[in-house]
A protein has these predicted regions:
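Ordered, amphipathic secondary-structure segments that act as subunit-interaction surfaces
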Residues: 54-92
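Cytoplasmic-side transmembrane-helix entry/capping segments in multi-pass membrane proteins
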Residues: 15-21, 45-49, 70-81, 105, ...
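C-terminal ends of transmembrane helices
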Residues: 1-10, 30-33, 57-70, 115-125, ...
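Helix-coil boundary and interhelical linker segments in multi-pass alpha-helical membrane proteins
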Residues: 33-43, 89-101, 146-157
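Short, structured motif recognition centered on aromatic/hydrophobic residues
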Residues: 19-23, 30-36, 104, 108, ...
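Small-residue-rich transmembrane alpha-helices that serve as helix-helix interface/gating elements
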Residues: 108, 157-171
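Alpha-helical membrane segments and adjacent membrane-interface helices in multi-pass membrane proteins
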Residues: 15-55
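Structural signature of hydrophobic alpha-helical transmembrane segments
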Residues: 40-54, 98-110, 161
Length: 184
């Protein structure tokens, strides 16, 4: 939904809002699959396109009350970031890649849709200037790798714990205004 809301702020028409929402939702996973030389995930599952379409239509209708749901939208965005990070890492692990590459794939999966969105909207990407976003993916990804490689916890426990770590990092960074240092 963040893509749809960003496009509506720029006063795009319905088609533009749909395109920006779509690119935001699938951009990171698309880049990941291209890097892994795998079929792009959304081309194999029309359900994904349907969910994006319906979510975008819902975003258009709730735009007027968006301010009432900022905390909820932030929470869902953070949960989605954690989920996409885990998906990217697991794709790397399935390809038997080095853990650092797996964390990189998780970060790409979680963040690059937003980077593409911001570039299409003619903005400096948010993760390069404002929020702790990619850092949350990297820390959460390292946590996931450690749990998977060196613990006897179940996969589900590792996944849920990692999502919680990412949500907590995002929440604390917003609450306490954490930012990455700027290079001057």
């Amino acid at each position: 939904m963040s893509g749809a809301f960003a496009a509506m702020q720029k006063r795009f028409d319905v088609f533009g809002v749909l395109i920006i929402a779509f690119v935001t939702a699938v951009g990171g996973g698309t880049i990941r699959d291209i890097l892994l030389d795998k079929p792009v995930f959304w081309t194999k599952d029309i359900f994904i396109c349907g969910v994006i379409f319906l979510s975008t239509i819902a975003a258009i209708f709730i735009k007027s009350i968006e301010k009432n749901f900022k905390v909820t939208l932030f929470l869902f965005d953070s949960i989605g970031l954690g989920l996409f990070t885990i998906i990217g890492i697991q794709k790397g692990l399935q390809a038997d890649l080095h853990p650092i590459i797996c964390i990189t794939l998780g970060t790409i999966t979680g963040c690059f849709g937003g980077i593409i969105r911001d570039i299409l909207l003619n903005r400096i990407p948010l993760i390069f200037r404002k929020e702790i976003y990619a850092t949350a993916c990297i820390v959460g990804g390292a946590f996931f790798i450690l749990l998977e490689k060196y613990s006897s916890f179940t996969l589900s426990f590792s996944q849920i714990s990692t999502i919680l770590v990412i949500v907590i990092i995002r929440t604390l960074s917003l609450k306490y205004h954490w930012k990455m240092p700027k290079i001057r």
